[in-house]
């Protein structure tokens, strides 16, 4: 799984200096973080709607498709902020085996 994320991160990084009209990602970078966040919000809503529909229909193909869009745009956001998806994977590894209640309590204590 991480190989796919690493390869995508490399492509996203390479688009940062590309001409705006050369790719969708390059155009997002040129429009700035607010546009990237707008797209991320749209994809979040589309994922939620797809999940609600899947709960009724039993067909998860749309929720998988929309989740891929959500992950993709999350990675564009991370790249725009100079972060690699490995940082998110490291955070998930840190939380693995940690009680959700304990993790939340640790955050609120800080």
Curated annotation (Swiss-Prot):
Enzyme kind, highest EC tier: hydrolase
Pathway(s): Amino-acid biosynthesis; L-histidine biosynthesis; L-histidine from 5-phospho-alpha-D-ribose 1-diphosphate: step 2/9
Record's GO cellular component terms: cytoplasm
Any one GO MF annotation of this record: ATP binding
The organism's place on the tree of life at top rank: Bacteria
InterPro entries referenced in this protein's UniProt entry, alphabetically: HisE (IPR008179), PRib-ATP_PPHydrolase-like (IPR021130)
CDD domains noted in UniProt: NTP-PPase_HisIE_like
E.C. designation(s): 3.6.1.31
Catalytic activity reported: 1-(5-phospho-beta-D-ribosyl)-ATP + H2O = 1-(5-phospho-beta-D-ribosyl)-5'-AMP + diphosphate + H(+)
NCBIfam families (alphabetical): histidine_hisI, PRK00400.1-3
Family annotation (PANTHER family): HISTIDINE BIOSYNTHESIS BIFUNCTIONAL PROTEIN, HISTIDINE BIOSYNTHESIS BIFUNCTIONAL PROTEIN HISIE
Family statement drawn from the similarity comment of this UniProt entry: Belongs to the PRA-PH family.
Record-given protein name: Phosphoribosyl-ATP pyrophosphatase
Gene behind the chain: hisE
């Amino acid at each position: 799984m991480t190989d796919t994320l690493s390869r995508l991160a490399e492509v996203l990084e390479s688009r940062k200096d590309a001409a705006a009209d050369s790719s969708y990602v390059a155009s997002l970078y040129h429009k700035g973080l607010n546009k990237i966040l707008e797209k991320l919000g749209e994809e979040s809503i589309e994922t939620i709607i797809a999940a609600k529909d899947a709960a009724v229909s039993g067909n998860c193909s749309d929720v998988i498709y929309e989740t891929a869009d959500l992950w993709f745009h999350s990675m564009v956001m991370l790249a725009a902020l100079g972060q690699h998806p490995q940082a998110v994977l490291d955070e998930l590894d840190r939380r693995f085996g940690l009680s959700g209640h304990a993790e939340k309590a640790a955050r609120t204590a800080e």
